[in-house]
Amino acid sequence: TLLGCCVVLPLSAKEDRLVLVGASYGKNVLAICEADGTVLWKHDTAGPQRGHTGHHDVHYLKSGNILFHDTWTKTQEISLGKKVVWEYESAKANGNEGKRVDVHAFARFPDGSTMIAESGIGRFIHVDKKGATQKVVSMGEGGRKSTRLVRMLGNLLGKSLNVNK
């Protein structure tokens, strides 16, 4: 049984019997499960030994791959064969070296580029498949510099961590 803090998403409207789970805080696993909880596929993730204790976002992509964050700074796309097919290290890329950054949310655009919410730094960065910056949007000042969840709805809708700061 996969218990703990989880992100649970149906894989698609057509496959509503399958569920993608990101279980953390001691479980440190991604899984595809039947609706009854039977695990069909499982991938162990970094966990606390690499400073990571929570999956706040996970996406099942049209390609059949999974987009998730393996540490607080590394966003990865893996195949169901568990091969890393894309990754972006926010701690080292695009001017972030030496800065405090943590990633809680991200999304893939139809063209294959990716939006990553870089909390601490306080920006939404849009990178291409090679990791080059396409666009940067500031999260604003104060408590808005940290997010937990972001969704693209024609704009960016973000859940702030410390709204009253």
Question: How should these model regions be labeled?
Answer:
Residues 1-10:
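Bacterial N-terminal signal peptides
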Residues 14-165:
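Secretory-pathway ectodomains
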